[in-house]
């Protein structure tokens, strides 16, 4: 009986031992699993933290002059070299990642880390989205609807109207010439004895002034023209520029017709910028950070060195010489002003009468009375052109010129036109209307957006390269955002991928 009790006791004791052993194993397994889980999540948190710090560290190395001068944040993916270096960027990302891992509490539990994949958002994409985001920040609210499309349509219509009027006057003169009956020899002899009234033809004077060069004609006498020149062949997005057109003969209707045709392209609505509010805000940005032909008239603390002085003019025209860019912009400005000034003359009975009287004297002197209509129109075009030269000179002196002039804002009287010299083109002291910079905005707003932004990047690159440490700077290499994936091997036998991204 006693032996039987011992057997039963030993049996139950063995069962308890097995149960306790199993319980211990279960508890140990749970604890080990919890430990592994704790280690895994701790390593995971450290890995994610290291990933964020890695991309933070990379983008913190933005190009300082790009931020200071042009308010643009971007990282140079070329590291001061011409070519983009993804390998070097990946190495820097991984190096910073590993250093942050080593500084973590669970560094011993992260056995190995590698960079699995890196993707970059470039500052300059096809739609200019990220560049525009940077340069239009806090400027969009200042952009308003200025009725630009209406203005350009009006200019185009008036330019076409002037061209059509000249064509009609020419056709009428030719018809009158064909219908003119032959005079008798006696009438001719009698007419030949008549004393002809003489008048100086202002067309000769304006033609002479113009054909000495647009800078001579349209710049005030004291204006100092920049002689800076910069090759743009080594920029990220090179392209060719546009130069000013040739001579004009104000006594030749075909020459004037050619002038109107060239101007028609400037006012072509097909070239009109039909972009977003951001595109318009970008024009205000350009005015703030780039110089133009009147910047020297302002008090400015900006002492940055620049490859060109007429930067806005370069964006509009794209030539490598300041002088050529100024010529091209003045040509556009003359087109706009001349069309509007001619419209004013055609709507002024007093001015029309003055011109017609002079045209009659010139026609009589030339014995071509049936061409008086053509001569009168050419005189009106000449007057409008001379007034436009005066407008350009005033604008370059920091004065204002209204889009549509009145008798009160008109500078050159017809009496002055009949005795015109180049010095008379100066003296307009306009204080109402638009400044030179305002007219530049019009040209920028109607310019092709890709052309405009490419040329803007040319100036940014070339100006930054003037600093020795950025001599090989290229905007095409600049990164705006990064997305990276790191592969990690943990001591608990798990692998974990960290994916993180950041942009400016």
Which residue ranges define each predicted feature?
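Alpha-helical assembly-interface signal, strongest on the long, hydrophobic N-terminal helix that forms
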Residues: 2-84
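Long, compositionally biased low-complexity segments
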Residues: 64, 72-504
């Amino acid at each position: 009986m006693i032996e039987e009790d011992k057997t039963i006791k030993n049996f139950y004791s063995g069962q308890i031992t097995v149960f306790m052993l199993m319980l211990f194993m279960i508890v140990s397994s749970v604890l080990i699993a919890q430990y592994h889980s704790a280690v895994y999540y701790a390593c995971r948190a450290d890995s994610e933290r290291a990933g964020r710090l890695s991309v933070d560290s990379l983008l913190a190395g933005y190009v300082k002059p790009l931020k200071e001068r042009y308010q643009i944040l971007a990282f140079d993916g070329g590291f001061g070299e011409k070519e983009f270096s993804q390998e070097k960027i990946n190495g820097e990302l991984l190096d910073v990642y590993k250093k942050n891992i080593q500084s973590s509490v669970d560094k011993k539990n992260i056995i190995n880390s590698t960079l699995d994949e890196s993707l970059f958002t470039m500052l300059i994409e096809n739609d200019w989205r990220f560049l525009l985001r940077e340069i239009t920040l806090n400027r969009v609210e200042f952009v308003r609807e200025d009725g630009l499309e209406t203005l350009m349509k009006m200019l185009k219509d008036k330019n076409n109207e002037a061209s059509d009027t000249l064509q009609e006057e020419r056709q009428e003169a030719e018809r009158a010439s064909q219908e003119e009956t032959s005079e008798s020899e006696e009438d001719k002899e009698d007419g030949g004895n008549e004393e002809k009234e003489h008048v100086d033809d202002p067309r000769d004077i304006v033609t002479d002034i113009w054909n000495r060069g647009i800078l001579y004609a349209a710049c005030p006498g004291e204006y100092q023209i920049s002689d800076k020149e910069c090759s743009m062949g080594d920029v990220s997005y090179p392209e060719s520029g546009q130069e000013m057109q040739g001579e004009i003969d104000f006594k030749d209707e075909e020459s004037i017709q050619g002038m109107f045709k060239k101007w028609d392209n400037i006012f072509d609505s097909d070239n009109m910028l039909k972009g977003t509010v951001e595109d318009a805000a970008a024009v205000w940005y350009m005015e703030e950070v780039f110089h133009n032909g009147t910047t020297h008239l302002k008090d400015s603390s900006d002492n940055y060195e620049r490859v060109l002085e007429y930067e806005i003019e370069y964006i509009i025209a794209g030539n490598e010489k300041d002088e050529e860019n100024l010529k091209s912009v003045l040509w556009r400005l003359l087109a706009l002003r001349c069309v509007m000034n001619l419209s004013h003359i055609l709507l002024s009975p007093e001015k029309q009468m003055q011109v017609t009287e002079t045209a009659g004297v010139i026609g009589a002197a030339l014995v071509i009375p049936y061409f008086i209509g053509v001569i009168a129109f050419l005189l009106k075009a000449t007057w409008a052109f001379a007034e436009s030269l005066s407008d350009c000179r005033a604008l370059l002196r920091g004065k204002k010129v209204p889009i549509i002039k009145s008798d009160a804002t008109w500078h050159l009287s017809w009496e002055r036109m009949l005795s015109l010299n180049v010095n008379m083109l100066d003296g307009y002291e306009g204080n109402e209307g638009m400044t030179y910079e305002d007219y530049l905005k019009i040209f920028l707003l109607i310019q092709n957006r890709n052309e405009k932004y490419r040329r803007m990047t040319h100036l940014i690159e070339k100006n930054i390269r003037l600093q020795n440490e950025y001599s090989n700077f290229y905007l095409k290499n600049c990164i705006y955002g990064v997305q990276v994936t790191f592969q990690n091997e943990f001591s608990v036998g798990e692998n974990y991928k960290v994916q993180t991204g950041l942009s400016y």
